[in-house]
């Protein structure tokens, strides 16, 4: 039952449902309609597999911006790799179908996504066009450390303007985003 999965990460078959509910669940099994972050954000803390899946999908979300705009990514098959996935996987990282949740629990979805993420990340870091789209942290201004929003362990992204910063700089400085500050100043 979706409610047990989303609230408790419980996939047991001990819950009985009516024939109507059974048919309905079968019909929606592959439909991506569950926003886990909106329904139960604490679920990511309950399941390491779901947490890892969310990290992979967030990484794909940021990688797609580079891959879909790079002509070299088309030539070396990276765009095709991305497009083998349903678009919601990389466009909406918190949206899941029941099938996705089951495959996450079984580790099957991770086996599909991880090689794709590795291939795309490798392309971005080696491609001159993609690498040129990297960020310099505006807080520390370290030009030798090019950062990318898909490096979730070391970067933070401003929710307002999507600028990218070292997480340590962003959190330690307790500053508002410099780009948002400039934009706000210009409007006055």
PLM features: residue spans?
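Cys/His-rich zinc-coordinating modules
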Residues: 3-159, 168-174, 178-188
């Amino acid at each position: 039952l979706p409610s047990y999965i989303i609230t408790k990460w419980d996939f047991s078959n001990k819950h009985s449902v009516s024939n109507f509910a059974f048919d309905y669940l079968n019909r929606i099994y592959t439909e991506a309609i569950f926003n886990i972050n909106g329904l139960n954000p604490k679920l990511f803390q309950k399941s390491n597999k779901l947490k890892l899946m969310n990290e992979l999908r967030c990484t794909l979300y940021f990688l797609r911006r580079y891959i879909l705009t790079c002509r070299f990514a088309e030539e070396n098959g990276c765009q095709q790799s991305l497009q083998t996935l349903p678009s919601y996987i990389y466009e909406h990282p918190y949206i899941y179908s029941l099938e996705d949740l089951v495959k996450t629990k079984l580790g099957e979805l991770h086996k599909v996504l991880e090689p794709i993420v590795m291939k795309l990340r490798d392309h971005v870091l080696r491609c001159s066009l993609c690498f040129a789209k990297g960020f310099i942290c505006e807080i520390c201004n370290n030009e030798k450390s090019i950062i990318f929003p898909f490096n979730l362990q070391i970067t933070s992204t401003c929710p307002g303007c999507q600028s990218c910063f070292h997480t340590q700089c962003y959190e330690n400085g307790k500053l508002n985003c410099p780009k948002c500050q400039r934009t706000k100043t210009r409007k006055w």
